[in-house]
Amino acid sequence: MTANLPAAPMLYREFSTQAQIDAQYNPSIALADPAAPGKHFVAQSALARASLKQHLDIPFGATVHETLDIFPADAPNAPVFVFIHGGYWRALTSKEFSGVALGLQRRGITTVVVNYALCPWVTIDEITRQVRAAVAWTVRNIAQYGGDPARFSVGGHSAGGHLTAMCLQTDWARDYGLAPDPIKAALCISGIYDIAPLRYSYLQPMIQLDDGVVRRNSPAYTARACATPTWFTWGGAETSEFARQAQSMHAAWGALGNQSELRPIAGADHFTVLAGFERPEGELCAWLAGQLGV
């Protein structure tokens, strides 16, 4: 007779193995060609830099990685969108995401793409600090590039969605001497708002999570009262965990009386969800334009 073996302990929620967690959080696993999204982003970014006005590699901090790429709108005093790229905090740069400006520029919105240092050379705590500093610098200085700091928005994708949510937790008045809520709209795309499961994933050797990093950098558990209208979105074809992450953050945000929307991009995967920035009529461009009054 075969003895009944004890059930495997759970690493996170209903997941007992790294393979199960990786299947949820590694969006490249399901792709026929894992290199295709990167090639697309590079091509769109090259198009943006070849066709749009730009100010590249503007420093906002003391380190070589702390730079901004600014794509001004044609009209002066334009609303502003700061984009924070993904790459699970350990890959990619601002240069792969210049294409975000393609649709927004035609909507009359100035786009600022943030570059930051990466894990494992720095921690997620430090990346969060750098991104907050980038936002503060842009609020103070974007008027020099034709932007209107009174119509200022922030958004990001994947790790950038997480970092956008971390920006929304910031005490801007205390820490940066700004208005309490300088961000007038926020767009969190396919973000990770409870980073605990990634401690048990293929990413752990690079991002090096511990209890303190998880606690300090899981915005689903540190939400504050905030006046910024926010859209938590993800690709409708993404895994159940990406949907649950957005749902959990939306619930935490709403529990404090904050204003947010919860709605996926129909049919999109983790990468094609960004197509909404490539055309002015794209869903992401349209939402931002509505929030910023253009």
Task: Label each PLM-derived region with a short phrase.
Residues 2-294:
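Alpha/beta-hydrolase superfamily serine-hydrolase fold, recognizing
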